[in-house]
Amino acid sequence: MEKKHGLAALLLLFLLVACGPSGNYGYPLKIGFGREGGTKICSGKEGFYDVSINDYNGNGETKLSKGENDTIIATCYWLTVKYKGPFNNEMKIIAEPNTTGKKRTLYVYCMVDNSGATIKVTQSK
């Protein structure tokens, strides 16, 4: 009888996990860079179709441009995001070297399924 209760509890746990939210659509919640900057590739479970970069208060103008091979480039302050066309699930995040002497933070917002995924990007001083 005790095994049945344990099995039922385990099954209930699996059902609750399966019905939960998609957890930022598989994209990382946070990415960190050292003061030297660099490049990181991140991906999610579902494709996104728009990217913007802002600070915590929503400030910052994302400049969009087109690169080679249909690459879209989004830049705001010290951070650049490159990705291939709409509905891609992979992006390249590039941080410039930090010469400010202060830790800095920006947020990458991706539109996924009429909702959004948010990636907090930090860089050490």
Where are these regions (language model features)?
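C-terminal motif of bacterial Sec signal peptides marking the signal peptidase cleavage site
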Residues: 15-18
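A short beta-strand micro-motif common to beta-rich folds, especially ectodomain repeats
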Residues: 100-114
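Bacterial signal peptide processing site
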Residues: 20-23
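Bacterial N-terminal signal peptides that target proteins for export
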Residues: 1-7
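Surface-exposed binding patches on compact interaction domains or structured appendages
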Residues: 46-92
